[in-house]
Amino acid sequence: MSNRRTWETFEAMRQAAIEGDAQAQCYLGVCFQNGQGVAQDYHEAVKWFRRSAEQNDPVAQCYLGVCYLSGAGVPQEFSEAAKWLREAADQDDPAAQFNLGMLYETGQGVPQNYAEALKWYRESAERGYPSAQFNLGVFYETGQVVPQNFEEAVKWYRAAAEQECAPAQCNLGLCYQTGRGVEQNQQEAVKWFIRAARQGDKTAQHNLGLHYASTETEAEAAIEAAKDTPR
């Protein structure tokens, strides 16, 4: 929520929300959603998100869309999620653009349309949203939506990986391991696998295990070869 107003106290924010301030209403919704300063209450969160969203606040529109997407505080309804996410996406909210892209990719709440998914992922990725950067990287790596381009895949994986997106760190490690889109470099591969593994990424943990097992086997083979070498 950059470039957003702040209030000195929770009560001042709540009063501003009651008096109709859209940003305060959005913040109050977040407080109810997360249980910050109040008891967690998803229905109250939705109430305040809706009041703010109806005043065209893009952050609240995104939150409301995600509530419909997940069924938190409202019945899950993908078409309603798409409606609010589009409102926010059209105002350049990167989280909304990413989530709208996901709906187009999966065909939930909107007709499945990979070109639209690509469009919204790119909009979001260019605004620095890591999950969108990762998905855009996947599109370029697989070549199913855009022409396959490993260099572009690496570019977007790296952008997301540097923001601690674990799947992107894992995929960037794989690119270094295999030399796809980047010069092969096992040390770099291990570095990114470790960063992803520390966040609990199972694929990275598996790849790291394979790497160390292979390294150990190579070391043992080298020792045995040295033993057999005539002196």
Where are these regions (language model features)?
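Hydrophobic face of amphipathic alpha-helices that form TPR/SEL1-like repeat modules
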Residues: 27-34, 63-70, 99-106, 135-142, ...
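Short helix-capping/linker turns of helical repeat alpha-solenoids
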Residues: 18-21, 34-36, 41, 55-57, ...
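Terminal, low-structured helical/coil segments at or just beyond the last alpha-helical repeat
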Residues: 2-8, 16, 207-231
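N-terminal segments that cap or nucleate solenoid repeat domains
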Residues: 2-34
